[in-house]
Structures are given as C-alpha cells and as structure tokens.
Amino acid sequence: MDLETLAWGYGLVEGPRTDPENNLYFSDVFKGGVFRRTPDGTIETLVEKRRFVGGLALHADGGFLMTGGTVEHWNQGESRTVLALDGITSFNDLHPDADGRIYVGTIRSDLEGLKAEKVPGECYRIELDGSTTELYGDVEISNGIGFSPDGSTLYHADSTSKGVIVHDVGNDGSVSNRRHIGATAFERGIPDGMCVDTDGNLWVAHVGGRRVVKLSPTGEMLDEIPVPAKAVTSCAFGGPEMTDLYIVTADNLDDPDRAGTVFRTT
C-alpha cells in the first residue's frame, strides 16, 4: 500500500476527520490550530493558535467539536464551550455514537513533559441536551476512541497501558464489561489515535512503531501499514467509499524538514 503526502510542515498533527464533501480536518497539538484541506489541495486555517486539540468531530448543526482545555463547538468563526472541567490538563480524542452523543477522554498528566507521575483520566459522555456523565476512570493517557459498526462496543486507546480499553455499550449509552485488548501489538511504543472500519476492525496509530496496525475486534493483529515517521499519531477513514485511510504524524523520516505530515493511502 502506497502513501500520498497531502500536507506537511506542522508540529504534532492530530484529529483527522473528513466530511461528506471529502474535506479533511486536522489539528496541530503543540503549534496550535485547526485546519481544513479541500479536495483540490487548498489548506485553510479555521482556528488559529488553539493548542492541545487532540480530537475533532463534525457537528450536526454545522461546524465541528474540538478538544483542548475545554470541549468547544466551532461554527462559522464562532466558538461556544460545551464542556469544561476543573483539574484536567486537556480533553483529548472524542467520538460521536450513532445517536449523536459524544464520548471524550480527559488527560490529567503533563502533556508536554509527560512526567513520571501520571494522574489517570476519565471518559465522559456528553448528551444531546449538553448534560454530561462520567462513564469510567483509570485511563492514564487517553487517546483514540471509536465504536463498532453496530455501536454496541466502545474502544478507547490508553497509551500507558499499551492497549485498548473495551466496553459493551447499552442503548442508553451506558458502558459495562470492561476489558483490555491489543497489548501484544504495542510491546515497543504506544497506541495513539484510532478508527474502526466497516468490518469492525481497529486501525491504531503506533507511536514508536512507525506504522498503523490493524487489529481484530478482540485484539489480534491482522495487518500493518508502514509509515515513515517515528510518531504516527492518528488515522481516519474518508473518501467516496470511506476506504481511504488518512494518517497523521509528528515527524517525517523521508524528509525531516517536512515535520508533521498528513498522508493518504493509495
């Protein structure tokens, strides 16, 4: 599988998402900003300077949700706060379920230094009316979030535990039956952002592994896509058939001057 380079020159790229017009949205965690790449290759800056945006999700009312120190709904240049919590460093990845509820993870550890003392974060659910529920804790470094195609299973990458936390999801959005999968795939390096394909398999960015790994729903490694970067940070499906995989990084080993890069499988 070949990789096409779509954008470069960023810091730590995160949050790839596509819309029905095949625009690609992504963020730069440390340099700051949220960007949109149109199908013709034009790149627009939508949000300037906002740092620690680890997750983006399209909003039914237009615009998108973005994380950072708070969860914000951005639309046509205006931003409103959806969720703010005391005592956290940042909200990181987030993902909607089929009913539009948002599942978002928190980070309480130092994002830039990742000091030895790590404070576990949580996963919250944001309801359609804006109310929130803490679903579970003990997520040391919260990363990618995704759902099985039928919405019955929630996947949540925890970088410190080197695997993916899994829960069953009820019709009311509640979670149960916590378990942990995929650790053998990340013996070197850590899992970061992720997405789930239409067959229910997980595609997980592997920081320190120079790849995206494909896992079965029970955590067995099925395949991998080599990526020319030490820090492969996230991935997302897009394209007319939702079969193009967009992969983002914090570096580029083929051309170090390009730094954080956006790739697409071809």
Where are the regions a protein language model picked out?
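Short loop/turn segments immediately following beta-strands, especially the blade-tip
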Residues: 167-174, 266
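A short loop-to-beta-strand structural motif that recurs across blades of beta-propeller domains
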Residues: 33-35, 70-72, 121-124, 163-165, ...
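Beta-strand initiation motifs
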Residues: 1-2, 41-44, 76-81, 126-133, ...
